[in-house]
Each structure stands twice: as structure tokens, then as C-alpha cells.
Design a protein with these regions (language model features):
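Tryptophan-paired
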Residues: 4-112, 146-150
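Extracellular beta-sheet/turn segments enriched in Thr/Pro/Gly and aliphatic residues
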Residues: 99, 105-150
Length: 150
């Protein structure tokens, strides 16, 4: 969270109520018998409609001074596809009802088998891509049992 949220004693409570991602295709034909599994996103007909999804809230990291920035994480699963810059929008809404929106300047390709992190900075009445940008890493296997994801 950017400087707009910096307070003398830091930021102890999460100011973000929700995160939504708009402009994505959310339906696909998946062939689990093929190796590797094939995912074909449906982009036409009744199921080929761009949709909005609500991201799952994750960890909030508070700060105790005005120079540090608090952090909030959200997560969601998006089918592999090209996110069109004309339709793709990330919206963060605060607990006071204020909305912050970000759209990319270029299309973004989401590949199968990768975990993407979209690093945004919110404050000064805007939502921008931070210097860390967008990162992509391969999914990793872990032993069974309860797990928390990013």
C-alpha cells in the first residue's frame, strides 16, 4: 500500500475490502487424457463471455511507522489465456468504498503450469504496477496435507 495509507504510527488494519479481476474467460474444454493435459479456453458462443472474478483475500502485513508500506495479498486461479489489455482490469475496493483500478498497457499471456504474481502499489488515488512488475514461476510439488498458497 502506497503513501496515501501511511500514518504516523503505521497502518495496523487492512483498508482493502475486495479485489476483483475483470475481462477474463472463465470456461474451458479440458482434455485430461492428453499428456500434458490440454486446456482450450472457450472464447465464443454462450460460454465465451469475458467475466469478473472475486479474488480470495490473503495475508495482510501491517507496519508500525509512516515510512514503511503495508502489504496485502489476494489470490485467484485464471485459466491459461491471453489477457487483452482492452478488457483486463484489476479493481481494489477499500473499506470506505473507494475504488482503485489498474489495466495493463500490453496484453498479458498466462501460461499453463506457472504461478503469476502481479505486484501493484495502491495510493495517491491510483493503482500502478510496482517496480517488481509481473513475475511468473513454475508451480512446485509439495507433500500432501494442509497448505496455504500465495
Amino acid at each position: 500500500l502506497g503513501t496515501e495509507f501511511n500514518k504516523k504510527d503505521g497502518l495496523a488494519t487492512d483498508p482493502i475490502q475486495s479485489a476483483t479481476i475483470s475481462g477474463i474467460y472463465n470456461h474451458a474444454k479440458i482434455d485430461v487424457w492428453d499428456n500434458p493435459v490440454k486446456v482450450n479456453v472457450i472464447t465464443d458462443g454462450v460460454w465465451g463471455v469475458r467475466e469478473k472474478i472475486i479474488a480470495t483475500p490473503g495475508a495482510f502485513t501491517s507496519v508500525d511507522n509512516e515510512k514503511a508500506n503495508a502489504k496485502k495479498q489476494f489470490s485467484c486461479i485464471v485459466l491459461p489465456q491471453e489477457l487483452n489489455k482492452a478488457y483486463f482490469v484489476v479493481t481494489l475496493q477499500t473499506t470506505t468504498g473507494k475504488k482503485y483500478e489498474w489495466s495493463p498497457t500490453e496484453n498479458i499471456t498466462i501460461e499453463s503450469g506457472k504461478k503469476y504474481t502481479l505486484n501493484l502499489s495502491m495510493g495517491d488515488n491510483k493503482l500502478v504496477l510496482s517496480k517488481e512488475g509481473i513475475t511468473a514461476n513454475a508451480w512446485t510439488d509439495v507433500a500432501g496435507g494442509p497448505r496455504e498458497t500465495d
